């Protein structure tokens, strides 16, 4: 099985060294709009195994970090860092949710059942498994984007003012608040309202510092 995975994903692995680059944004993080209509509790998503629709209202009272992920990306090194972030901040109510997507460099080519083996045996490999919930693979931009991402993007301006059109991106139409690449992040507060958004190039250490500063207002750290 390991050999089959390595052969099947040869092309995505060659592409994994490619991380979309843009002119450095003015900010790595942006606060979300103050007049957001609705909450994440109005939405749900299909679990990675396809057996369960998980309503986001089950995360009421939690601080939720939404991340669009990919197995064969140069930023896949963030997976272990996200595991550590979940472990460190879980006692303070943080929940990380991962959403596999193949729209950026086609770096999530497998079906849902192939994603966890790819992570475990290929990249990051060495038996790695995420300690946070993964959902079924789907679009985060374009006409078939998941509704939760329509809501998140509408609620939060993008840190970069540059809209990138590239042969490595696969969706239409292109919109100003679109996710630019794998591993962008949105933080949602315990009331279900989006709080802040990070550019994909923001280090997880920076994301952690920002979240801890935010949590300090709740007197939980």
From Swiss-Prot:
Q: What is its main location?
A: secreted
MF terms (GO), sorted A to Z = glutathione peroxidase activity
Tell me its EC number(s), please: 1.11.1.9
Tissue specificity field = Epididymis.
The UniProt entry, under InterPro entries, shows: Glutathione_peroxidase (IPR000889), GPX_AS (IPR029759), GPX_CS (IPR029760), Thioredoxin-like_sf (IPR036249)
Q: Please write the reaction equations for the catalytic activity of this protein.
A: 2 glutathione + H2O2 = glutathione disulfide + 2 H2O
Q: Give a GO biological-process term.
A: cellular response to oxidative stress
Q: Which GO terms describe its cellular component?
A: extracellular space; sperm plasma membrane
UniProt cross-references to PROSITE patterns, sorted A to Z:
GLUTATHIONE_PEROXID_1, GLUTATHIONE_PEROXID_2, GLUTATHIONE_PEROXID_3
* Family affiliation: Belongs to the glutathione peroxidase family.
* Official protein name in the record: Epididymal secretory glutathione peroxidase
Q: Species name for this entry?
A: Mus musculus (Mouse)
């Amino acid at each position: 099985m390991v050999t089959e995975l390595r052969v099947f994903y040869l092309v995505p692995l060659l592409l994994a060294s490619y991380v979309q680059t843009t002119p450095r944004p003015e900010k790595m993080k942006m606060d979300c709009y103050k007049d957001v209509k609705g909450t994440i509790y109005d939405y749900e998503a299909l679990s990675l195994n396809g057996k369960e629709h998980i309503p986001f209202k089950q995360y009421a009272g939690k601080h939720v970090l939404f991340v669009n992920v990919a197995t064969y990306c140069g930023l896949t090194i963030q997976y272990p860092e996200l595991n550590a972030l979940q472990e460190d901040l879980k006692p303070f109510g943080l929940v990380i949710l991962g959403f596999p997507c193949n729209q950026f460099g086609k770096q999530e080519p497998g079906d849902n059942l192939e994603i966890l083996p790819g992570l475990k045996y290929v990249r990051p490999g060495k038996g790695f498994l995420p300690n946070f919930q993964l959902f079924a693979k789907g679009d985060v931009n374009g006409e078939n984007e998941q509704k939760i991402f329509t809501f998140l993007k509408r609620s939060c301006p993008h840190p970069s003012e540059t809209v990138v059109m590239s042969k490595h991106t696969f969706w239409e139409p292109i919109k100003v608040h679109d996710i630019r690449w794998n591993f962008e992040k949105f933080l949602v507060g315990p009331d279900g309202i989006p709080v802040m958004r990070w550019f994909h190039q923001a280090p997880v250490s920076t994301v952690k510092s920002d979240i801890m500063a935010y949590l300090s207002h709740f007197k939980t750290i």
